[in-house]
């Protein structure tokens, strides 16, 4: 999400997440190694998540350019989208942490898209006036450790 703040909250964690365009490795010759425009990408089949935070940001960016995107596949399961990209030809817009291994292993390619660098934030809050349990503190500790490992 975008950075949030309230006088009623304690922000226990905030981690910036880059959201990136990726494509099937089979599109490397056509799309890889160059700066693309969003309009150039729209000719490709898109495999996208349902209307969540990063998809909403992409749709806003497209609307500002008076452009819309109709995905070939829309699914709430990010791992399924990644598998579809790995076996078929398509493009997606996903958090870097979700696609990093597939890109490093050459199963997907990361695309450079002109004027479309987007970051969102993973955040954990607690209410200042409410009790925080040991279990909640442990959850935050584990979440921070997971971020450090990435």
Outline where the language-model segments fall:
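Acidic, Gly/Pro-rich loop/turn segments at junctions of secondary structure
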Residues: 1-44, 53, 98
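Short beta-strand->loop
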Residues: 10-20, 105-119
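Alpha-helical segments flanking ligand/cofactor-binding loops in enzyme cores
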Residues: 12, 39, 82-83, 137
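Secondary-structure junction motif
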Residues: 29-31, 43-65, 132-134, 140, ...
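Hydrophobic hinge/microswitch elements
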Residues: 54, 59-111
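A late-sequence structural motif
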Residues: 109-150
